[in-house]
């Protein structure tokens, strides 16, 4: 990662033991990289699924909440983890200039219901989500001013409960399918932007030990490799529930710019309240 001034300044405002730049170096023979198995990570993983990268790395794919736990347990060395988990690490390092963010509407993280927002009495929370659930709570209490009952879920059955005054937070590829079914769709990234004027960062690449500058440069290059092939990557997925070309190019933001890091900072500040 480039040690630019904005990153260094921002790192000082992250949780006390979270850093953007390494202090020491660790050497690993085969680095395990935990990534999210959603469509939005396909461009990031494009440069990691080649023989050269896989000679020194192993990819582990799962949904966001599991990747965070795998990092904590040492199952993976680097993980694309929900931003909401950053304060839970005793010490953490953001090791890439890339992640999963949205400048406006993200399309794949939404609250779905059959009634308007003010009439929702119960919300079922997607079991695959951490940052999205935290964002929903912030929007409810800080901006929407609603207090429905929140229900944790454990399996895919929760989507069938979107009826009457019961709503559900749905993330990832399943959100595209749910968009076709629900009457009301509240895009959480768009709502966040409307209230704060900032982008929202959903996930960042994190390690619990510092990585070498050489490795960070290589890892950034791997993340960047797919950015010039978004149309080709979209076409290769053969996905019909949503226009992936539009999704990759206009809904998802991959580079962690200064403005996007400001959005992350604001989210972490509000997260302390909850």
Regions found by a protein language model. Give the residues of each.
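Cationic, low-complexity basic patches in intrinsically disordered or flexible, solvent-exposed regions
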Residues: 10
């Amino acid at each position: 990662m480039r040690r630019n001034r904005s990153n260094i300044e921002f790192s000082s405002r992250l949780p006390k033991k979270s850093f953007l730049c390494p202090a020491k170096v660790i050497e690993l023979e085969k680095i395990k990289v935990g990534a999210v198995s959603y469509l939005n990570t396909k461009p990031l993983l494009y440069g990691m699924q080649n023989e050269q990268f896989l000679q020194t790395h192993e990819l582990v794919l799962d949904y966001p909440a599991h990747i965070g736990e795998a990092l904590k347990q040492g199952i993976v060395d680097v993980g694309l983890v929900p931003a909401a988990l950053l304060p839970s690490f005793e010490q953490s390092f953001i090791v890439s200039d890339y992640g999963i963010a949205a400048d406006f509407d993200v399309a794949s993280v939404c609250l779905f219901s059959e009634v308007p927002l003010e009439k929702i009495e119960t919300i079922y929370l997607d079991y695959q989500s951490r940052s999205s659930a935290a964002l929903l709570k912030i929007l409810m209490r800080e901006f929407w001013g609603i207090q429905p009952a929140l229900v944790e879920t454990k399996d895919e059955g929760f989507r069938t409960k979107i009826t009457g005054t019961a709503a559900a937070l749905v993330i990832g590829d399943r959100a595209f399918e749910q968009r076709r079914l629900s009457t009301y769709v509240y895009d959480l990234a768009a709502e966040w932007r409307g209230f704060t004027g900032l982008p929202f960062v959903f996930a960042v690449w994190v390690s619990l030990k510092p990585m070498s500058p050489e490795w960070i440069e290589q890892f950034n290059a791997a993340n960047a490799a797919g950015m010039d092939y978004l149309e080709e990557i979209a076409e290769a997925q053969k996905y019909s529930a949503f226009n992936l070309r539009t999704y990759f190019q206009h809904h998802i933001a991959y580079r962690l710019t200064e403005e996007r890091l400001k959005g992350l900072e604001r989210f972490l500040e509000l997260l302390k309240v909850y």
